[in-house]
């Protein structure tokens, strides 16, 4: 990022009015002061860095609101990487190294899930690691999505058209069924689903917890894998899609200019197939559902595609919540010191 791009800030403070953290945490100076205003000071003297920048959850709602298109969240995250003195803790390492924890946990998922669900264990995690006992930890799937995909791979190759599915950590370790369901939908559109030869976590948990060098290495690995073919790349996670497209060059200085436009949300890709004349045999679903728009989907401007797909389901009544951050923000809401703000 150009170091002077923050000069486009017109000091209107609209970013601060939309920031979910500054509303409830008086210790956070807000995106304008933490971002453009603070950057002017930091460029003069790095000692002026404010550790309160750690309260930024990188939801990007400040960037959505900014009339001058200042990359406020990027400025804050890059400042944390460059000037931050606070070293990551063991708790931060556990929460952010999702591939490691998932690989260790999925073979023993029933035992791990039962153990971490016990109140005494949760209180012990709170006392020892500051992982708040009031939070319910995500459950692991028994076996990974990539392992389950092996049984589907031969059939996928039979389709004349193909897409690559960047499944991300949640599908791979926590909810493999979501990946299987996506494959069924994509297959119904006459397209096969391939996986990257080697996929690592997109890097967002590492960035959020201060492991920038590790995040950069994983980004480089993912970009190299994506360059092995020229197929469209779809993701069910808006954060994964956003990170692959925008955070790699903006925060990690990993060039993805040759493949950025190939990456999109699965719902956007599906909507485009339907708009081109393909059809899906949708069964009636007489339910009323409430939908919350993820922050990073809002940032990409792609919320409409998901909502329009849901509205195509016969019998489904859709109510869209006001667009607000959910408060969890990846690993942020699991930390004891952030619980009250997260709530």
PLM region spans:
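Secondary-structure capping and boundary motifs in well-ordered enzyme cores
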Residues: 11, 45-51, 55-58, 162, ...
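Iron-sulfur cluster-binding electron-transfer modules in prokaryotic oxidoreductases
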Residues: 72-343
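Non-heme iron-sulfur electron-transfer modules
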Residues: 21-51, 69-93, 340
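Intrinsic structural disorder
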Residues: 1, 9, 19, 32, ...
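Short, intrinsically disordered, charge-biased short linear motifs at domain edges
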Residues: 1-6, 42-53, 187-189, 312-315
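Cysteine-centered iron-sulfur cluster-binding motifs in ferredoxin-type domains/subunits
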Residues: 3-22, 48-70, 101-102, 295-296, ...
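Short N-terminal binding/cap micro-motifs at the start of the first secondary-structure element
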Residues: 16-18, 25-27, 174
